[in-house]
C-alpha cells in the first residue's frame, strides 16, 4: 500500500515506514505527529483518487529531524564591466517518517 501526498507544494510517493524529506514544517518539533493531505491511495489493485473519499483520509507521519540541505551558489556576472555578485542559499528541510496510511472506505 502506498499513497501520493502533498507537502510544501510538492508531491511525494510514500509507504508506511518511509522517511521522506519535505520542505521545513515550522510548526512542529521533533517527535510531533503531522497529517499530510492525500492525493491518491493505492492498495493492491484498488486505486482511490476520488477527492470526496480522499478528503477524509490523512496520512500520519512523525517528525524525525530538521536540517539544512546542500549549499548552492548563485553567481551573476556581466562581461567587461567588473560586475559580479555572489549569493548562497541552503534550503531548510524536515525529515518525516510515515506511520500510518488509512485504508479508503469501500
UniProtKB/Swiss-Prot annotation:
The keyword Electron transport does not apply. Pfam families: Ribosomal_L21p. InterPro entries: bL21-like, bL21-like_sf, Ribosomal_bL21, Ribosomal_bL21_CS. GO terms for molecular function: rRNA binding; structural constituent of ribosome. GO terms for cellular component: cytoplasm; ribonucleoprotein complex; ribosome. GO terms for biological process: translation. Keywords: Ribonucleoprotein, Ribosomal protein, RNA-binding, rRNA-binding. HAMAP family: Ribosomal_bL21 (MF_01363). This protein binds to 23S rRNA in the presence of protein L20. PANTHER family: 50S RIBOSOMAL PROTEIN L21 (PTHR21349), LARGE RIBOSOMAL SUBUNIT PROTEIN BL21M (PTHR21349:SF0). Part of the 50S ribosomal subunit. Contacts protein L20. Belongs to the bacterial ribosomal protein bL21 family. This is Large ribosomal subunit protein bL21. The gene is rplU.
Amino acid at each position: 500500500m502506498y499513497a501520493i501526498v502533498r507537502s510544501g507544494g510538492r508531491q511525494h510517493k510514500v509507504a508506511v515506514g518511509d522517511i521522506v524529506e519535505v520542505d521545513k514544517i515550522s510548526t512542529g518539533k521533533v517527535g510531533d505527529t503531522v497529517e499530510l493531505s492525500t492525493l491518491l491511495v493505492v492498495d493492491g489493485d484498488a486505486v482511490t483518487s476520488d477527492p470526496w473519499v480522499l478528503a477524509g483520509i490523512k496520512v500520519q507521519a512523525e517528525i524525525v529531524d530538521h536540517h539544512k540541505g546542500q549549499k548552492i551558489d548563485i553567481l551573476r556576472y556581466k562581461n567587461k564591466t567588473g560586475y559580479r555578485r555572489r549569493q548562497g542559499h541552503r534550503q531548510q528541510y524536515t525529515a518525516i517518517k510515515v506511520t500510518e496510511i488509512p485504508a479508503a472506505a469501500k
